[in-house]
Amino acid sequence: MNVSDFDYHLPEERIAQEPVMPRDASRLLVLNRASGAITHRTFRDLPDYLRPGDVLVVNDTRVIPARLLGRKPTGGAAEILLLEQLDAATWRALIGGRRLTEGATITVLDKSGEATDLVATVIAEGPESLREVRFDQPLDEWLDTVGYVPLPPYIHTPLQDDERYQTIYARPAGSAAAPTAGLHFTPELLLDL
């Protein structure tokens, strides 16, 4: 089997640009493993396909505003996607922008595009765009002011409501990306399970 066996054409206009309302009205593709029959249902029908003893595993972390926009000393744009907090001011991150080697600095921009007093310095380089960055101040105090909820690269519509990319059972902050498989659950559906 080759990975290319799973390639298929998906027209861009068929990709939803915002979550469906209500959440459980999203479509559900069901495969009958015995017969190979495929049926199309809605996510709220999920309990019809689960049996006693089945287990659902969920990611209950809240998505943090982990996408930061910044400016290099040259004036060029830079983007930081926070992945893992190493200490109060140090993060492992993906950084988009050329020539951001060890020692490079990025001034973080606020949501209006203005420079803030928050500066990130690249302290270690990894493969591809992976870097360790140290902020000159603890980032927790800044995230809500300067950070954006990261969206998948195929979503081009600006996010109107950050809560739409949180699951209804999200508790501890920590995800750098929305656990999209869990976005379809509603309180009523969880009670039905």
Summary of predicted features, one role per range:
Residues 1-193:
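A cross-family signal for N-terminal binding/gating loops and helix N-caps
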